[in-house]
Amino acid sequence: MSDVQVHQLYIHGRYVEATSGKTFNSINPANGEIIATLQQASEQDIEAAVKSAQQGQKIWAAMTAMERSRILRRAVDILRERNDELARLETLDTGKAYSETSTVDIVTGADVLEYYAGLATAIQGEQVPLRESSFFYTRREPLGVVAGIGAWNYPIQIALWKSAPALAAGNAMIFKPSETTPLTALKLAEIYTEAGLPDGVFNVVQGAGREIGQWLTEHPVIEKISFTGGVETGKKVMASAAGSTLKEVTMELGGKSPLIICEDADLNRAADIAVMANFFSSGQVCTNGTRVFVPKSRLADFEKAVVERVKRIRIGDPMAEDTNFGPLTSFPHMEKVLSFIESGKQQGAKVLIGGGRATEGELAKGAYVLPTVFSDCTDQMAIVQEEIFGPVMSILSYETEEEVIQRANDTTFGLAAGVVTQDISRAHRIIHQIEAGICWINTWGESPAEMPVGGYKQSGVGRENGLTTLGHYTRIKSIQVELGDYQSIF
């Protein structure tokens, strides 16, 4: 371990020694090797990060919107210049295929930052006349210091999705990356500093355990929490934020999304969409369409088409250019996914392909799970009810449109949904009845910077991306002006 780099915290534009005396390791899930050791933040370090953020935010908010925009655009340029380097690090840390991280993760994160850099100058209030001698106007002001808590599946993309609107609106952000995949968030902090962001405007405090998240959610200075993660943790974060200082929250939580294949769907297109909706990023996407509803009349042909495509998935070393399916992000998560697969078998679902761990050759060293497709599924099975967050597709048959809509909505989640059909009227009719915040027709998975994303029900609160998200990072001040005499009743 002598050649393993030790990473400090990133506070006030530089790396600083953590005061906890504790460390944790980042593990390469492709082979189980330690790739980095990270110092863990203490409560004292959180206080230092908050004070730093307060100082930096005052400087940042005092800049013109155009100045802030230019700095954020410089960060975009640096991200794109360093795309391949960052993608390699993301692949080492997450296990995601380099063919994916190099074309999606940094690229889409930079797109979101560029989008909000352009919107920084568009934040404005309004002026409304009340009568000849009086009017009021509004100002949209930054919240101040906000915190982001990231998930492990899209580390740098999530850090950018959270920081971009926050910084564009004039806030400072303290970001806690997942302890499983913390490395690229630290690189992002370096890039922000290089681009000219004032010290303290983006601080990174990493650590294992729940204490850091709790210190952030309960801190009286922090005005907002943006969290991405599981439902149960999200509920605790939200309760803690409300119980401390009534903080604003954005919650991007779990999903168990339905993909409805209609009777008139092009079978090849439907199978392509289903495979992408389940096995992209090794199945570790919160919006995955893991409940695939297929008409009974087309079930056999659809299952055959899906299996043919799954056989073409290239599992292997995530750094290899031809690999498009890497390991899961951690060994504990692999065990969780495998337990769900065993549950599916025990509850009577039929394995069409996959169904276990990948152990061929070098794959045995990593957290690899075979792309798995279950048929003969019922709505009551655990693999259909619960979020697995892995490469597990459940195929369910249906007979009528009314039936499939009811079953698709029969879940506590409401993150995403999709419909595949050649009848555009049917597509809209179904989608308008589905209880989900992100919906796709004849496609799946794209989340452009301009599109607000977020869930219904227990899948989340608030939105990320799009114009509406800027409102989550500002507050409105109303000012009335009287030009005439003031008449008192006393």
From Swiss-Prot:
Location of Cysteine sulfenic acid (-SOH) modifications: C286
Catalytic reactions of this protein: betaine aldehyde + NAD(+) + H2O = glycine betaine + NADH + 2 H(+)
InterPro entries the UniProt entry points to: Ald_DH/histidinol_DH, Ald_DH_C, Ald_DH_CS_CYS, Ald_DH_CS_GLU, Ald_DH_N, Aldehyde_DH_dom, BADH
Top EC category: oxidoreductase
Any GO molecular function: metal ion binding
Positions with a binding annotation for K(+) 2: L246, K457, G460
CDD domains: ALDH_F9_TMBADH
Highest rank taxon of the organism: Bacteria
EC number of this enzyme: 1.2.1.8
Pathways per UniProt: Amine and polyamine biosynthesis; betaine biosynthesis via choline pathway; betaine from betaine aldehyde: step 1/1
Entry annotation: catalytic residues: K162 (charge relay system), E252 (proton acceptor), C286 (nucleophile), E464 (charge relay system)
Alphabetical UniProt keywords: Metal-binding, NAD, NADP, Oxidation, Oxidoreductase, Potassium
Positions that bind K(+) 1: S26, I27, D93
Needed co-factor(s): K(+)
Residues annotated to bind NAD(+): G150, A151, W152, K176, P177, S178, E179, G230, V231, E232, T233, G254, C286, E387
Function statement: Involved in the biosynthesis of the osmoprotectant glycine betaine. Catalyzes the irreversible oxidation of betaine aldehyde to the corresponding acid.
The family this protein is said to belong to: Belongs to the aldehyde dehydrogenase family.
Subunit structure of this chain's protein: Dimer of dimers.
The protein's name in its UniProt record: Betaine aldehyde dehydrogenase
Species whose genome carries this gene: Acinetobacter baumannii (strain ACICU)
Species classification: Bacteria, Pseudomonadati, Pseudomonadota, Gammaproteobacteria, Moraxellales
Gene: betB
